[in-house]
Amino acid sequence: SGGMQKRAAIARAMALDPEVLFLDEPSAGLDPSTSAGLDELIRNLSESLGVTFVVVSHELPSIFSIADTVIMLDKKTQGIVAQGDPRELRDSSDNPLVRQFFLREAAGAEVT
């Protein structure tokens, strides 16, 4: 399954004992339950082994599950739009691009 393939890829990368691991859309194409399990695995590996994960994602449930810090980029300017705790950005950002992202994405995702 897709979830097992992604877990195996992470396991292969972790065998190299990295300090930082880059994951590009790790939960893309997975059903919500499998995605949540993968998010939990990433979070547990980060906490237990001290590995920093840099995760590229557009999926709010994953962002809120995994991220301690979010850096949002603007596709047009290729610059940083906002940076910080994902919940603080969601709840208090005055930046229209940040607000638009969270509003657009929240329409299909439950985030606590």
Question: Which residues make up each language-model segment?
Answer:
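A short, proline-enriched helix->beta-strand linker immediately N-terminal to the Walker B motif
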Residues: A15-E19
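Helical segment within the ABC ATPase nucleotide-binding domain
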Residues: A36-S48
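A short, surface-exposed alpha-helical micro-motif characterized by mixed small hydrophobic
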Residues: I63-S65
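Conserved beta-strand-loop-alpha-helix hinge in the C-terminal portion
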Residues: K76-F102
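Catalytic Walker B motif of ABC-type/P-loop ATPase nucleotide-binding domains
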Residues: L21-D24
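Helix N-cap at the start of a conserved alpha-helix in ABC-type nucleotide-binding domains
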Residues: P32-T34
